[in-house]
């Protein structure tokens, strides 16, 4: 599933092709995504100029003078900038054609993504209203994380993956951040000290920043706006390295299951 670094990579990649461009046509080949694509989407967009491309958690928001276009990449979706005559692939569901002669094309094999229209303030939309702070923003700091963990028995990895606590810390990045912080993923969140929370905030920021700089992580489906892959998978320290030597101490990396997801950690470095 595209996580925060992949979505931010997509945002940066498409913004220069989208902002300031007028929509000349909208092609909806498959309206049955996670939620139905609005039937009047073409009417709402055609002839209008697109503004900034924003990101909130894993949602992309494209400004239009009459509202906001919300996009979500689901489990395996991607957005590519193509020419109108670019060969269609199976699961290319929606094109936004622009006056530049380019199209923004949504590819979504599992159809778990979303293309929705927002009128009114974005923060009040049901999909956005209950989200926690951005991990790279000023509201996510040591004091906030420490307060959020008090009296919580849930494992710290599951705690930081809860989008009500903080957004965008997906499975890969949670394992990597906890490794760098030296914190075992199964520890109860409420047992962390303030110093450990401060360290974890910094490693979450570090890992996400590194992943964005590398264009995200491509394990299966994710591609960037030009069809290229992300490269952060080449820099993973523990994720997917079961039985291999820890890069810090050479102890074999362990794999466990938490909340139906694989977790990777070093039993010597993380406590």
From Swiss-Prot:
- Species this protein is from: Thioalkalivibrio sulfidiphilus (strain HL-EbGR7)
Encoded by which gene? mutM
Q: Which family does it belong to?
A: Belongs to the FPG family.
Q: Supply the alphabetized keyword list.
A: DNA damage, DNA repair, DNA-binding, Glycosidase, Hydrolase, Lyase, Metal-binding, Multifunctional enzyme, Zinc, Zinc-finger
Q: Which cofactor does it need?
A: Zn(2+)
Q: Which residues form the active site?
A: 2-3, 58, 261
The protein's name in its UniProt record: Formamidopyrimidine-DNA glycosylase
Tell me which SMART domains the record gives: Fapy_DNA_glyco (SM00898), H2TH (SM01232)
Oligomeric state and partners?
Answer: Monomer.
According to its UniProt entry, the protein's GO biological process terms are: base-excision repair
